[in-house]
Amino acid sequence: YEKTKHTVQARLLDNPSRHSKLIYFKDLFNEKIDLKKIHDLEIMYWDVFIKSTQIDKKSIKLLINRKENKDFYFLFTNQNTNIQLRKINSWGLNFFDLVITSEEVGFEKPDKKFYDYADSYVAAKVKKMDTKIYAVGDDYRNDIKFWQNKYNARSYLIDNKKLEPLSSNTSVTDSTGESFDV
């Protein structure tokens, strides 16, 4: 699976479909099992992933309870729109005012074209009212850096390896192996 995943990701380097588990399974099992079973594998993969993922319910409750009418929650993500909406609804995260996926933009974070598209929505809200920007994510370069540079956003970087949030005054290593003081 991992070898096929890396092959697909190399082939679809700048394409949001590079995260498609369906494409991984299709390439992995091509001519070995029928297409229905390949499709069923993808469904089973996401069913198990969604059910087994542990969501910090305390943090979710805090986000929901602290959200006021003037607050806007945006989610910008590299993944298939269908899968992201499935995860959002299954995990009780249906409080975002706007969700933008790389699939619908045609570019992935950290591509500037992705941020330009997402920022057109953020900039419109910032212009209308006195707004504070908070960037939350598990990858500094993908989730936080742009928003800090453009809006001096406060950040909250989540370390998935430790499953604990890191304070914004921490040195971290992102998925590329690059270290940053945040």
Segments from the language model and where they lie:
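Asp-based, Mg2+/Mn2+-dependent phosphohydrolase catalytic module
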Residues: 79-182
